[in-house]
Amino acid sequence: MAGSDVDSEGPARRGGAARRPGAPGGPGSEAAAGCPEPLSTAEAPAESATLPAWMRLYFYGMHGITLDVLVSSARRFARSPDLRMLGFSSPYRCLLHSLTHFALEKVYLQQRRCPNAFVFNFLLYPSAHVGLQTLAGQALLLSLGGGAGVAVAPGALDLALQYVLALYHCQVFLKRFLRLRYGRQRRRQQQQQQQQQQQQRRGALPVPPGARVPTAAGARRRRPRGPRGAGGAPSQGLPDLPRFLFFGMHGFLDEIFFTFFFNVLGQGDGTTSGHTSLWSFFMYGSCSFVVEKLYFHLHYSRGWGTWKRVPIYVIFIYVWELSWGLGLRTCGACSWDYSHYPLNFMGLITLMYLPGWIFLSVYQDLISNVLWRVQYVPAN
């Protein structure tokens, strides 16, 4: 969504956002038990593997932007209460979050080698986290400011906040995130099983494993996606709550990137950050969650193609944006205003961003296809 009157912390006006793809003891044995890597053969699904590096980097950047927005919004609200709950971050910080958290992941995985879990969890890892985040933040300030006098040493409150975030990463986030597994070979094996079943129904010989079966002329090919649940949706993958959290964080990512590039390219005011609102988390998280359900139903149950589904997505998105805008505007919490754009309705929706919604609707389907192959393996 667009923030219309952002103060000096962010751009003065925002034209709207193509948002939404539409997201962690004791010594010895206790330290080893608390480390999720690697899973034993009994714990890990036979067809799953650790999340690929690119996927972890993607999520670390998105998660880092979410923390930036939460912290900056809380600080801004404490100074000047504003129900729009604006928060700030930037693509630069997204890249830094991806790299620093990827490095801290490697530090976290050394937990088993530390003889004392308490020392690692409350001293060693937090020290590495605070030091790396401080260095990255100072490097970003120097590179953007262009002068040696720009960087300022962090205060005691900043260091305390970084320590709390380090405990969150070690005791909560990484402890659960690193138990996610990605099913790489599931699609091919399920496709072979379906082909074998089809051949057996026709009275033909079973297909040898790994062999391809030619599709009959004129036959309609449906991409197998595994066992189906209610409404034709895949019955495997992440539960609903983690999916909602992922979509909400991705809404932050989309808004930060869009507002940053909109202000750099459109206004040229030299801004170094983008902005969003805390309400966007719930708005885009719920919107993407429902659109994903539409995708599963229209694609798997009805067999609709992409360009037949996209108009349904876009209509729903506009209705959702208008409904949230009306609700937030009544209590002075609406962070966007499209009144200065043509083809707008009540300043809450505009056809100017139709191409962006179409692109993100297609991207949403791609994300859903990836997410259903991600599984959470709980600790024994």
Curated annotation (Swiss-Prot):
Q: Tell me what organism the protein belongs to.
A: Homo sapiens
List where Low complexity composition bias occurs.
190-202
The Gene Ontology CC terms held by the record are:
membrane
Name of the molecule in the record: Transmembrane protein 229A
User: Keywords on this record?
Assistant: Membrane, Transmembrane, Transmembrane helix
Positions of disulphide bridges: none
Give the protein family: Belongs to the TMEM229 family.
Q: RNA-binding as a keyword? A: no
Q: Which InterPro entries match?
A: Tat_dom_sf
Q: What is its main location?
A: membrane
What's the superkingdom here? Eukaryota
Q: Using the UniProt annotation, give all residue ranges assigned to the region (Disordered).
A: 1-40, 188-236
Protein location:
Membrane
Q: Which chain regions cross the lipid bilayer?
A: 51-71, 117-137, 244-264, 278-298, 310-330, 343-363
Membrane topology per record: Multi-pass membrane protein
Asked whether the keyword Membrane is assigned, the reply is yes
